[in-house]
Regions:
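Short, composition-biased linear "edge" segments at structural boundaries
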Residues: 313-323
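Membrane-integral, polyisoprenol-dependent glycosyltransferases
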Residues: 2-306, 313, 326, 331-332
């Protein structure tokens, strides 16, 4: 074998056979639609968000309220999440009169969850196409082709998201939390695709950072945007692309500055850690520990053996690649 890659993975072409697209799309449809269609708002957060949307959509005349300061029964939104409520209110206003208003309000959130799945697939695909992620090249051929290998990795990433997303977050509620998830994933897609499709990635990064800030998480938008720019600045694998990478970093930082100015003008800065949120983090951590049992103790025992030291040494360049660190930076 000719070891032209820093990744020690040995993958033959037969191991990355194409998963039929209709199967993958069927899984996605089966995940997205049942949770949104044929139900009424089912939890306090879901009902509260629908109340803000309905109030915005129906307010007129002397009862007109400010779309920049949504309120419900005289109480302002504690999350300061404008964009999710705007989307729901616009959907209610534009929907046919025969359509139930709660279903109409959920339509944009069906789109946001679909965007989450699509951005995940294309973001993972872009990272899997990078040289650091490619498997070993065989001396006499037969190794996995880059496009097929990346597609298999992206399929696995999307299926893993479908399997685990419900554990970490209720993704079928028309709330600002789903909008935050969607825009965070869109930012992951944008940063992963900057070396390949710059214009589309620039636009996606701008939409993601602004959308995340207007969905009740401006501080998180700044952390993810600046963190992503920092990771790109550390990437020295292609010195010839230094100038283009510098432009990309400057663009992301400029978006963050413009978004910070917009959020300041609207008075939307929020940064608080409530005790209930700490308890939620503890519960999620405990749940993930049990969900991954016994994979994580097996992984620890495998990496502790002497025979694994050479493997980890050969994997070091790929693992420490800035692009490989990007998904971990964007995990919330």
């Amino acid at each position: 074998m000719s070891d032209t890659s820093s990744n020690p993975a040995i993958v033959a072409q037969g191991a990355v056979r194409r998963l039929p697209r209709w199967v993958l799309l069927s899984f996605c449809l089966a995940y997205v639609l049942p949770g949104f269609v044929g139900r009424t708002p089912w939890k306090a957060d879901d009902m509260e968000a629908f109340g803000f949307m309905l109030h915005l959509a129906q307010a007129m005349g002397p009862e007109t309220i400010s779309w920049l300061k949504p309120s419900l029964l005289g109480q302002a939104d504690p999350l300061a999440a404008l964009l999710p409520y705007w989307l729901g209110a616009w959907a209610i206003q534009l929907s046919p009169s025969a359509m139930p208003m709660d279903l109409a309000a959920r339509l944009p959130f069906i789109g946001l969850l679909t965007l989450t799945l699509a951005a995940t697939w294309y973001g993972v695909y872009a990272l899997a196409r990078t040289p650091a992620a490619q498997p070993v090249t065989f001396a006499f051929g037969g190794e996995a082709r880059p496009a097929d290998y990346a597609r298999a990795i992206a399929d696995g990433g999307l299926l893993a998201l479908l399997a685990c997303l419900g554990l970490a977050r209720l993704s079928h509620e028309a709330t600002p939390a789903l909008a935050q998830l969607s825009f965070s994933t869109l930012l992951f897609f944008a940063l992963a695709n900057l070396p390949r499709k710059r214009i589309g990635a620039w636009v996606s990064a701008a939409i993601a950072i602004v959308g995340l800030a207007l969905s009740g998480a401006p501080a998180l938008a700044m952390i993810l945007g600046i963190g992503g720019a920092f990771i790109m600045a550390l990437d020295t694998h292609k010195p010839s692309a230094l100038r283009a990478r510098s432009v990309d970093v400057a663009w992301v930082l400029l978006i963050c500055l413009a978004t910070a100015a917009l959020v300041s003008a609207l008075g939307l800065w929020r940064w608080r850690v409530a005790y209930s949120h700490v308890l939620e983090i503890k519960a999620i951590t405990r749940l993930l520990l049990w969900f991954t049992w016994p994979a994580w103790p097996t992984r620890i025992s495998a990496t502790a053996t002497p025979s694994s030291s050479a493997l980890w040494a050969s994997m070091a360049p790929a693992i420490t690649s800035p692009m490989a660190k990007m998904p971990g930076t964007l995990v919330r």
